[in-house]
């Protein structure tokens, strides 16, 4: 299997305030998906047992891929979608990190249904409830 350029621990962090999505490989070869403003710091937390419970006792852990994605909302949406993908998809992402932009863009597009025009109510339904529409 070809090694990714991300198999070595990265030495740079994303710009301050920017969120990243990352993949960590466990000793058993499983891939864990997470988000952080500092993936390297987060990896160290995972390695020390102070990170996600899912990774405790699963080391050694290796950060195999990371991508700066912007704000926390975008990071959460992308994390959710990436966690739904197969391991084969994630392995391909590790091997071909340049394809991330193509794959992730549709995940950030929020599709909202078109608004329907308000329905006009019949005239008799406009009167207040409890009113008999008589002048008194």
From Swiss-Prot:
Domain GIY-YIG: 17-92
Domain of life from the UniProt record: Bacteria
Cross-referenced CDD domains: GIY-YIG_UPF0213 (cd10456)
InterPro entries assigned: GIY-YIG_endonuc (IPR000305), GIY-YIG_endonuc_sf (IPR035901), UPF0213_domain (IPR050190), UPF0213_GIY-YIG_endonuc (IPR022992)
Similarity remark: Belongs to the UPF0213 family.
Protein name in the entry: UPF0213 protein ASA_0550
Organism for this UniProt entry: Aeromonas salmonicida (strain A449)
């Amino acid at each position: 299997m070809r090694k990714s350029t991300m198999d070595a621990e990265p030495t740079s962090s994303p710009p301050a305030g920017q969120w990243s999505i990352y993949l960590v490989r466990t000793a058993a070869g499983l891939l864990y998906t997470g988000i952080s403003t500092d993936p390297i710091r987060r990896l160290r937390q995972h390695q020390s047992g102070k990170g996600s419970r899912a990774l405790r006792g699963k080391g050694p852990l290796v950060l195999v891929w990371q991508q700066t994605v912007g704000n926390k909302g975008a990071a959460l949406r992308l994390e959710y979608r990436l966690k739904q993908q197969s391991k084969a998809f994630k392995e391909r992402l590790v091997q071909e990190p340049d394809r991330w932009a193509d794959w992730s863009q549709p995940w950030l597009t929020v599709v909202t249904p078109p608004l329907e025009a308000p329905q006009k109510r019949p005239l008799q339904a406009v009167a207040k409830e409890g009113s008999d529409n008589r002048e008194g």
